[in-house]
UniProtKB/Swiss-Prot annotation:
(6S)-5,6,7,8-tetrahydrofolate binds at residues 123, 127-129. One of its GO terms (molecular function) is glycine hydroxymethyltransferase activity. Belongs to the SHMT family. Its EC number is 2.1.2.1. Its main location: cytoplasm. The gene is glyA. It comes from the Bacteria. Homodimer. It is found in: Cytoplasm. NCBIfam families: PRK00011.1 (NF000586). This is Serine hydroxymethyltransferase. Keywords: Amino-acid biosynthesis, Cytoplasm, One-carbon metabolism, Pyridoxal phosphate, Transferase. Pathway: One-carbon metabolism; tetrahydrofolate interconversion; Amino-acid biosynthesis; glycine biosynthesis; glycine from L-serine: step 1/1. It comes from Ehrlichia chaffeensis (strain ATCC CRL-10679 / Arkansas).
Length: 420
């Protein structure tokens, strides 16, 4: 019988993959997930992403598909577009990009030609690979000029960016980051872009949920084009979007994504995006975003109380970035020690980091995922205390370190067992 396998459960068909999924579920539930680019999606988002839209190929856009049978695909994609525009107050949107990197590349393809000058934040100061970093296509195909932060404060130096813009005459300026925890002055970025005749791209991948909830400055009034992932603080499936208020730019982006960058869109992911956008439009999401920031601030306060240095001295978002140099500990050593005990974060470069990228002098923490789980300030203060205990133990004797490890394992288990 040809369809013999189609009705069987995963555990029967592929026990190895089933066991991997079961193991990952246990890992997520039993540990503290503090990677700033991660979150826990709702059951409804999971159901949409695991739906039969997986089966549907729908090259093109609603009303202009290259395949028949796209009636419901058109409806769900239009829902995603309408909800996204309502969420951010923009006029046009493309919900098809598979990732944030592809969204940024789609903007480059729409607005730039090879060799054009692009100004973006340097990787070690908090920028993203796609903001002109040398290993990325953005650094290979374009003349990438990187701005840094102030050495003393760790804050973006807008005067430096203006000087670079006047000197290099860019075609595109990128505002956004992957590890900059402070607010961004999108208005000043636009003023600089206008001064030199450049487009302004706001990459809000990390801040999107906070912006949607009104807890972080919005670039919609200022940016020519906005890109974002749909996971992270927006708490949707892994994917991306592109938004703009300019119809001419929107038309170019439509062509650059399809047929320029991608073929058939992932309709099951677009369905999940639509669900996530609907969730973000609810009043409860504003409360969630407020709690994200309260929790990250509580975490940062504990770090400072325990003598750790924070990049920029604090946070305005879901991110806290630690500078470990005063402890003579590397990010690599710290992150491995924490992971072993169920505290999951990532090693991270700090501004002007003397260490190599796979070693680093910093750690990055995010509060979005555990806030989704229900943790509040008191729990994040406890997390901060545990992190500090582990970092301090790395330079202690073996007996002290082992005692700390046993204590942290117990405390992590007690904390997570209350929020499964």
């Amino acid at each position: 019988m040809v369809g013999y396998i189609l009705d069987d459960d995963l555990q029967e068909v592929d026990a190895e993959v089933f066991n991997c999924i079961s193991g990952e579920l246990n890992r997520q539930n039993s540990g503290l997930q503090l990677i700033a680019s991660e979150n826990f999606v709702s059951k409804a988002v999971l159901q949409a992403q695991g739906s039969i839209f997986t089966n549907k190929y729908a090259e093109g856009y609603p009303g202009k598909r290259y395949y028949c049978g796209c009636h419901f695909a058109d409806i769900v994609e239009n829902l995603a577009i309408e909800r996204l525009c309502r969420l951010f107050g923009c006029k046009f949107a493309n919900v098809q990009p598979h990732s944030g990197s592809q969204a940024n590349q789609g903007v480059f393809a729409a607005l730039l030609k090879p060799g054009d000058t692009v100004i973006g934040m340097s990787l070690d100061c908090g920028g993203h690979l796609t903001h002109g970093s040398a290993p990325s296509i953005s650094g290979k195909w374009f003349n990438a000029v990187q701005y840094q932060v102030d050495r003393d404060t760790g804050l973006i130096d807008m005067d430096e960016i203006e000087k670079l813009a006047v000197e290099h005459n860019p075609s595109l300026i990128i505002a956004g980051s992957s590890s900059y925890p402070r607010v961004i002055d999108f208005k000043r970025f636009r003023e600089i872009a206008d001064k030199v005749g450049a487009y302004l791209l706001a990459d809000i991948a990390h801040y999107a949920g906070l912006i949607a909830a009104g807890e972080f400055p919005s670039p919609v009034e200022y940016a020519h084009v906005i890109t974002s992932t749909t996971h992270k603080t927006l708490r949707g499936p892994r994917g991306a979007v592109i938004m703009t208020n300019y119809e001419d730019i929107h038309k170019k982006i439509q062509s650059s994504i399809f047929p320029g960058m991608q073929g058939g869109p992932l309709m099951h992911v677009i369905a999940a995006k639509a669900v996530a956008f609907a969730e973000a439009l609810k009043p409860e999401f504003k409360d969630y975003a407020k709690q994200i920031i309260k929790n990250s601030k509580a975490l940062g306060e504990v770090f400072k109380e325990r003598g750790l240095d924070l990049v920029t001295g604090g946070t305005d978002s879901h991110m806290v970035v630690l500078d470990l140099r005063s402890k003579s500990v590397t990010g690599k050593d710290a992150v491995l020690a924490l992971e072993k005990l169920g505290i999951i974060c990532n090693k991270n470069a700090i501004p002007f980091d003397p260490e190599k990228p796979f070693v680093t002098s910093g750690l990055r923490f995010g509060s979005a995922a555990e806030t989704s789980r229900g943790l509040q300030e008191s729990e994040f203060r406890e997390i901060g205390s545990m992190v500090c205990d582990v970092i301090d133990s790395l330079k202690a004797s073996d007996s002290v370190r082992l005692s700390v490890e046993r204590d942290i394992i117990k405390r992590v288990k007690e904390l997570t067992s209350n929020f499964i």
